[in-house]
Curated annotation (Swiss-Prot):
Residues passing through the membrane, by range: 6-26, 48-68, 86-106, 120-140
Organism domain of life: Bacteria
Main subcellular location of this protein, as a coarse class: membrane
Cellular location(s): Cell membrane
A Pfam family hit: DUF441
Family, per entry: Belongs to the UPF0756 family.
Organism: Brevibacillus brevis (strain 47 / JCM 6285 / NBRC 100599)
InterPro entries, A to Z: UPF0756_TM
Alphabetic keyword roster: Cell membrane, Membrane, Transmembrane, Transmembrane helix
Bilayer topology: Multi-pass membrane protein
Name of the protein described by the UniProt record: UPF0756 membrane protein BBR47_12340
Gene Ontology, cellular component aspect: plasma membrane
Length: 149
């Protein structure tokens, strides 16, 4: 229990320094649940929270369409460009890699802690965006298969 408390506090503090308030709040929420020994609650919310996060991201990304920023004609013209082709390919590859990352994260906490620290350092040192945890874990999963580590 003490180890869990320390780890979550360190993540919260590093996140606060990096100004990643989402991770601060998540760490503190889970710290509270951990201190309350609310393991059944954490088990119950783990899978749905991933889907809630994806839902919020999709809403954010679809708002310009809902506001009428794009129409069929402009989208049709854009979709036959090289940029669109590369974007589709990139989306496919990143989604594939992300799927591999999602499968490795629950079973290997060292990967999560490592990519979290790397993400926080990127935010602190280079104005990075804390958006690549699952993709980074996917890269680790693929590399570990290739190099057997």
């Amino acid at each position: 229990m003490l180890h869990t408390t320390i780890i979550l506090l360190v993540i919260a503090l590093l996140s606060l320094v990096a100004k990643d308030l989402v991770l601060v709040y998540a760490s503190l929420l889970l710290l509270g649940l951990s201190l309350l020994k609310a393991v059944p609650v954490m088990d119950a919310i783990q899978k749905p929270m991933f889907h809630v996060g994806l839902f919020c991201l999709m809403v954010f990304l679809l708002i310009p369409i809902a506001k009428g920023k794009y129409d069929f004609i402009s989208l049709g013209k854009e979709m036959v460009s090289w940029k669109a082709t590369i974007a589709i390919l990139a989306g496919f590859i990143i989604s594939y890699v992300g799927g591999k990352g999602l499968s490795i994260l629950p079973d290997q906490p060292v990967v999560f802690i490592g990519v979290t620290i790397g993400t926080l350092l990127a935010v602190l040192l280079s104005n990075g965006l804390p958006a690549g945890l699952i993709i980074a874990a996917g890269c680790i999963a693929l590399l570990s298969r290739i190099f057997n580590f």
